[in-house]
Each structure stands twice: as structure tokens, then as C-alpha cells.
């Protein structure tokens, strides 16, 4: 049975040590690591350990994403894909072919990712419903505010506008 790990980013940061990553990679049973360390040197070390194994690293942090891809990360597995799935897909598919545009896009996506710190996941569900047009209700089991303020709605609209311009 192929297994994977999701490092816990919140509320208590739980990151796999290089020793644990080595054990998992050497076992042959682990195929997936959602990395949440947000540290390119830590990511680079894990990728070096996993080289040649079944285990693949998926970065959850936007600001280190492009550099992690250059070191061999397999992809992205962060919550911001709830806001910008097409932009992350483009980045992952085209970063080698169009490196300057990929850098530009990451420069936009990184500050956009700060919205994650405000009322997530309700903000993502509201964004998908109001800005993208998905037919979903903005409900969540997480203990956050039960509404999005006008300021937050304005921020979500601005993120949508910025992400639309990013692909022009």
C-alpha cells in the first residue's frame, strides 16, 4: 500500500527530520511528502535524500516553489491552489520553458498567498463562489469567523484582478 506524509503546518508545526525522510525513502513504501517547512535548504536536503526513491516532494509554500522545482520537487500541494489553480498549473507546466514569466508569476503569487492568513478556509470558499462562480456554499467546520468582512471581500476581488492580469 503506497503511503504519504503531510507535514503539519498548523497549529503545531511538525516537520519530518532528514533521518525520518531517509527511513521513509529507503523503505520503498512512501510515495508522497507534502512539505510545509517553508525553508529552501530543508527542502533541498529532503530532495537529495529522496533522489532515486519512490518518494516525491510536493511543496506547499509559494515563495519557495520555483526554487524547489529547480532542485527536483515534483509539484505543488498548497492551499493557494484553491484560489489560483490555473496559475499554479501554468507555473508547474511552464517554468522550464518560460523561466522569466515563471519568476514574474511567482512574484505575484507569493504576496497573494498572504490571504491564507486571513480567515482561511472561509476566504477560499468565498473566493471560489463570488470571484470564480463556483456553485458552493461558503461554510467551514474550522473555528473562524462565520462571515467575510467587506474589507476581506475587497481583498479577494483585488487578488482576482491581480491574478487575471498575471496571465495577460
Q: Model-found features: residue ranges?
A:
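Short beta-strands and strand-loop turn motifs
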Residues: 2-8
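Catalytic alpha/beta core domains of metabolic enzymes, predominantly
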Residues: 8-118
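C-terminal alpha-helical cap/extension of soluble enzyme domains
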Residues: 73, 80-168
Amino acid at each position: 500500500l503506497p503511503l504519504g506524509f503531510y507535514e503539519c503546518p498548523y497549529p503545531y508545526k511538525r516537520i519530518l527530520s532528514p533521518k525520518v525522510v531517509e527511513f521513509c525513502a529507503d523503505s520503498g513504501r512512501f510515495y508522497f511528502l507534502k512539505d510545509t517547512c517553508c525553508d529552501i535548504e530543508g527542502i533541498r536536503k529532503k530532495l537529495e535524500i529522496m533522489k532515486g526513491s519512490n518518494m516525491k516532494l510536493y511543496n506547499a509554500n509559494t515563495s519557495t516553489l520555483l526554487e524547489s522545482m529547480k532542485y527536483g520537487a515534483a509539484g505543488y500541494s498548497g492551499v493557494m491552489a484553491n484560489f489560483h489553480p490555473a496559475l499554479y498549473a501554468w507555473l508547474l507546466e511552464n517554468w522550464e520553458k518560460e523561466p522569466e514569466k515563471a519568476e514574474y508569476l511567482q512574484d505575484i503569487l507569493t504576496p497573494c498567498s498572504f490571504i491564507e492568513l486571513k480567515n482561511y478556509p472561509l476566504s477560499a470558499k468565498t473566493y471560489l463562489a463570488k470571484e470564480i462562480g463556483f456553485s458552493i456554499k461558503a461554510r467551514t467546520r474550522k473555528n473562524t469567523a462565520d462571515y467575510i468582512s467587506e474589507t476581506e471581500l475587497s481583498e479577494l476581488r483585488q487578488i482576482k484582478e491581480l491574478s487575471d492580469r498575471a496571465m495577460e
